[in-house]
């Protein structure tokens, strides 16, 4: 079915807007995956703030021009499902990786982060990135660690004095 010029422009503008604000992109081939399974994937993507789009490669190439994902042009061959991570850079990679384990016909083609095109074999590295909450928790624990050590050091001085006084007291009791 032919798409009109105005519709094509709208699709390009929509995908460009999404790509401009996305943190990472995962491209997959979903040929042979049932509609029911794709609906489940779309639902999971919505829950994780990942935007999925299936667009013609020529439109996708135009849409990513001027964004960090301009490097994916060579990976846009054949049917492509684009997964844009909007909040967590590893979200789309985790979703696609888990889905590919369940579906033999689902194949990750490439990924892109920070303006670099990565092969599909690098999906584990991207999927293992911590979520925003995990990263903030790690940062907080790193920031709190020196304060915790300082508090322990301050608490250790009085307890050493107390142990020394108790030892002297016990020594005097034994001597008497």
Swiss-Prot record:
A GO molecular-function annotation: large ribosomal subunit rRNA binding
Keyword Iron set for record: no
Alphabetized InterPro entries for the sequence: Ribosomal_uL10 (IPR001790), Ribosomal_uL10-like_sf (IPR043141), Ribosomal_uL10_bac (IPR022973), Ribosomal_uL10_bac_type (IPR047865), Ribosomal_uL10_CS_bac (IPR002363)
PROSITE patterns to which the protein is assigned, alphabetical: RIBOSOMAL_L10
Keywords in alphabetical order: Ribonucleoprotein, Ribosomal protein, RNA-binding, rRNA-binding
UniProt GO BP: translation
CDD domains: Ribosomal_L10 (cd05797)
Cellular component terms per the entry's GO annotation: large ribosomal subunit
The keyword Ribosomal protein belongs to this UniProt entry's keyword annotation: yes
Function description: Forms part of the ribosomal stalk, playing a central role in the interaction of the ribosome with GTP-bound translation factors.
Quaternary context: Part of the ribosomal stalk of the 50S ribosomal subunit. The N-terminus interacts with L11 and the large rRNA to form the base of the stalk. The C-terminus forms an elongated spine to which L12 dimers bind in a sequential fashion forming a multimeric L10(L12)X complex.
Family in the record: Belongs to the universal ribosomal protein uL10 family.
Protein name: Large ribosomal subunit protein uL10
Native organism: Teredinibacter turnerae (strain ATCC 39867 / T7901)
Underlying gene: rplJ
């Amino acid at each position: 079915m032919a798409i009109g010029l105005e519709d094509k422009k709208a699709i390009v503008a929509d995908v460009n807007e999404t790509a401009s604000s996305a943190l990472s992109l995962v491209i997959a081939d979903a040929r042979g995956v049932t509609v029911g399974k794709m609906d489940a994937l779309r639902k999971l993507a919505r829950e994780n703030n990942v935007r999925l789009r299936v667009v013609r490669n020529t439109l996708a190439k135009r849409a990513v021009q001027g964004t960090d994902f301009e490097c994916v042009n060579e990976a846009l061959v054949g049917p492509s499902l684009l997964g844009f991570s909007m909040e967590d850079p590893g979200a789309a990679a985790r979703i696609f990786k888990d889905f590919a384990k369940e579906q033999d016909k689902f194949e990750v083609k490439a990924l892109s982060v920070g303006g670099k095109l990565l092969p599909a074999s690098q999906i584990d590295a991207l999927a293992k990135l911590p979520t925003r909450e995990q990263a903030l928790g790690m940062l907080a624990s790193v920031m709190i660690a020196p304060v915790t050590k300082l508090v322990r050091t301050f608490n250790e001085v009085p307890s050493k004095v107390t142990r020394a006084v108790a030892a002297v007291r016990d020594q005097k009791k034994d001597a008497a």
